[in-house]
Swiss-Prot record:
Presence of the UniProt keyword Hydrolase in the record: yes
Annotated positions binding substrate: 370-371, 415, 447, 480-484, 530-533, 552
Induction behaviour: By raffinose.
Organism of provenance: Lactobacillus acidophilus (strain ATCC 700396 / NCK56 / N2 / NCFM)
Superkingdom classification of source: Bacteria
Alphabetical list of CDD domains matching this protein: GH36
InterPro entries recorded: Aldolase_TIM, Alpga-gal_N_sf, Alpha-glycosidase_related, Glyco_hydro_27/36_CS, Glyco_hydro_36, Glyco_hydro_36_C, Glyco_hydro_36_N, Glyco_hydro_b
Name recorded for this polypeptide: Alpha-galactosidase Mel36A
Family classification: Belongs to the glycosyl hydrolase 36 family.
Record key words, sorted: Carbohydrate metabolism, Glycosidase, Hydrolase
Length: 732
């Protein structure tokens, strides 16, 4: 065995997962109960001092046939709980047995330790380059009556403060059972008075940081829209009351799944915190036949004892290095212009060429053709599912226009919405059964469109074959994959009635299958995810697309909060952000061009406006922004991110530092001006205290320790929404 990250103490029946940053401890207790002991900072050895106290607690029952009233699964912190075993916490799993009961008593059976990390078939997952960089513990729990086995998977990386968990359920019985809930993980904490941080939102208002106390009872943060959703991102953090960006403990949980999800946080009668995370059990019922298995999505669990920045940096590193697979993840992202807010559906080839010509003059690197190029689509009422060029707009064919874009020295990108269908489409005329609906009922439209049954292979194959005919031309450099509605009328026509509870999850598996086939076939195409902006911004999506459109809201000031929340989990290279017109299309706000550019440079910079209608002054500013961005984008896209000032305040500040601490880019945004402004300072982070750094704008030189401990005064300017960027480089 090449690794030594997991130990088992046979005498005390304790597993210890450990590296230089974290330890995770679990033990086998009475009745084969798998008990949780500890997750936190690294300890070299464990001497069995955390055996849970034995107390005779009223109304907390005991093990079957046991006379020991001091041991109860109702109070013991556990690794995985089921319904019907005298544990009254929210269960991690619920099973419907052939006799109609939900009885399940999971007890320890065996364990094994493997080098590396197993792949998850059909699901996004973290991975290893070499087996010796991680080790995986698989603990098997069994119910002896039903002959169900639950494999709990725990992977620890050698150099990361991360535990990756998932669950496999195996039916070794003689009859089918129904899984009504299967969480990917459970975590119990004793003597912790946490606050919980989540990322709720709405369309054009995604991932706003929400922080609240946990009182006795159950909090649920979830989506049952069929996607990870704008409304509740599949992430949660438990933090101490005094935890901030740089200090305090933080436990982060991110689910690698793009469908319905559920995070349950419960403070029980004894003040203990109980957490479940996984697929939402809303309308979920999976038939598990004999000799079949069910695999849950993964959960990434991060521990930080140095605040939220360190938690985020651990997520960023893991997602970038061991979730993303695209070759583009390490490549500089091109500065693009997207025609959507410039033209909407009102365009033809000649009109687009004028935008392409202007993009070339301004130094942009890619033109992205958005919605409206296919079928006979002049509005959002038709043609979804018909992925053939609209001859009225492109009489010479799409390839002819792509050639023109390439001749100007730009890359060419194209918008698709492969999961959707319009009533008014050839696809619907030929295959009306492809449209997801409940038989005998009219389906609900959203944005005048409907959802395809992606759980069916024949439906996926049809869309795949249509897209291949376009993409095999080798004239497409980039794809924006959109999804502009939530799922409804959930039904899969090739499933029997007792398996309709599988339709939501089978849709997600079908989506992953189709997307995986395309990204595998076209490794030289940069894929960007999108769902009306950030409606499917999650770890699972990152496995297939290295960048995602963060929000349909392009207002720079609202983007501060959206991007701040996004950065809690997701690396900035994953987040696309565009400069748009002022007054803004979404809220009418008038914002300086400089500020719009500075905020967009937090992510992958692009432009979403009609370049041909800009003034000479605005055009000059674009040239200036693009020129400067090309100098700093390796740092801004791939550097270590530090959030310096919270977006909820009147100022928001952040910075990125390269891995050698030789270069840093800092941005400070002052939201509202005041007649008598406070004098504020910005202190930097992540620099080398022994290096000297030059401000490339002013040629002033400061010590790294000066910039981090003393900082500098922020400029005081008249007017709202002012931004200032600083570029520092280390000097000899």
């Amino acid at each position: 065995m090449t690794s030594n990250l997991i130990k088992f103490d046979d005498q005390n029946k304790v597993f210890h997962l450990h590296n230089k940053q974290i330890s995770y401890l679990l033990s086998i207790e009475d009745g084969g109960t798998l008990s949780h002991l500890y997750f936190g900072g690294a300890v070299k050895n464990y001497n069995n001092q955390l055996k849970y106290p034995r107390l005779d607690r009223g109304f907390s029952g005991n093990l079957p046939e046991s006379l020991d009233r001091t041991f109860s699964r109702d109070s013991l912190p556990k690794e995985y709980s089921s319904a019907g075993e005298m544990d009254f916490h929210t269960p991690a799993t619920i099973v419907r047995n052939p006799d109609g009961s939900n009885a399940l008593f999971l007890a320890y059976k065996s364990y094994k330790i493997e080098d590396g990390k197993p792949d998850l078939k059909g699901l996004p997952h973290s991975w290893t380059k070499e087996d010796d960089e991680a080790q995986t513990l698989i603990v098997t729990l069994e119910d002896k009556v039903s002959k169900l086995e639950y494999d709990l998977l725990y992977t620890i990386y050698r150099d990361r403060p991360v535990i990756v968990r998932s669950v496999q359920v195996h039916n070794h019985g003689e009859e089918a059972v129904y899984l009504e809930k299967v969480a990917s993980m459970q975590m119990d904490y004793v003597d912790k008075d946490f606050e919980v941080i989540t990322l709720p939102g709405a369309h054009a208002n995604e991932r706003r940081v929400q922080r609240e106390n946990i009182g006795q009872g159950i909090k649920v943060f979830s989506s049952y829209r069929g996607t990870s959703s704008h409304q509740m991102n599949p992430f949660m953090a438990l933090v101490d009351h005094d935890t901030n960006e740089f200090m305090g403990e933080a436990y982060g949980f991110a689910l690698a799944y793009s469908g319905n999800h559920k995070f349950e946080v419960e403070r029980d009668q004894f003040g203990q915190i109980h957490v479940n995370t996984g697929i939402n059990d809303y309308n979920f019922k999976w038939k598990l036949n004999p000799n079949e298995e069910f695999q849950t999505p993964e959960v990434l669990m991060v521990y930080s004892d140095q605040g939220l920045n360190k938690m985020s940096q651990a997520f960023h590193s893991l997602i970038h290095e061991r979730i993303m697979r695209s070759k583009f993840k390490d490549q500089i992202r091109p500065v693009l212009v997207n025609n959507w807010e410039a033209t909407y559906f009102d365009f033809n080839e000649d009109k687009l060429k004028t935008i392409v010509d202007k993009a070339k003059k301004l130094g942009l690197e890619m033109f992205v053709l958005d919605d409206g190029w296919f079928g006979h689509r002049d509005d959002d009422n038709s043609s979804l599912g018909d992925w053939k060029v609209y001859k009225k707009k492109f009489p010479n064919g799409l390839g002819h226009f792509a050639d023109y874009v390439h001749e100007q020295g730009l890359k060419f990108g194209l918008w698709f919405e492969p999961e959707m269908i319009s009533y008014e489409s050839n696809l619907y005329k030929e295959h009306p059964d492809y449209l997801m609906h409940v038989p005998g009922r009219k389906p609900c439209p959203s944005r005048n469109q409907y959802v395809l049954e992606l759980g069916r292979k024949e439906v996926r194959d049809n869309i795949f074959e249509q897209m291949v005919k376009i993409l095999d031309s080798k004239k497409i450099d980039y794809i924006k994959w959109d999804m502009n509605r939530s799922l409804s009328d959930i039904y899969e026509s090739d499933l029997p009635a007792d398996q309709q509870g599988e339709a939501y999850h089978r849709y997600v598996l079908g989506y992953y299958d189709l997307l995986n086939k395309l990204v595998t076939r076209y490794p030289d195409i940069l894929f960007e995810g999108c769902s009306g902006g950030g409606g499917r911004f999650d770890v699972g999506q990152a496995y297939y697309t290295p960048q995602i459109w963060a929000s349909d809201n392009t207002d720079a000031i609202e983007r501060l909060k959206i991007q701040y929340g996004t950065s809690l989990v997701y690396p900035q290279s994953m987040m696309t952000s565009h400069v748009s017109v002022s007054p803004n299309e979404q809220n009418g706000r008038i914002t300086p061009f400089n500020t719009r550019g500075a905020v967009a440079m937090w992510g992958d910079l692009g432009y979403e406006l009609d370049l041909t209608k800009m003034s000479d002054e605005e055009s000059d500013q674009v040239v200036k922004q693009v020129t400067e961005y090309k100098k700093i984008r390796e740092v801004t896209q791939f550097g270590t991110l530090y959030r310096l000032k919270a977006s909820a305040s009147n100022q928001c500040a952040w910075m990125m530092v390269d891995s050698n601490k030789n270069e840093a880019v800092v941005t400070v945004v002052n939201v509202m001006a005041h007649a008598q402004p406070y004098c504020t300072k910005t202190k930097l982070a992540g620099l080398d205290p022994d290096k000297r750094y030059k401000n490339l704008e002013t040629d002033e030189v400061f010590g790294g320790d000066e910039l981090m401990h003393l900082g500098f005064y922020d400029p005081i300017e008249r007017g709202d929404f002012k931004a200032k960027m600083y570029h520092f480089k280390a000097i000899n």
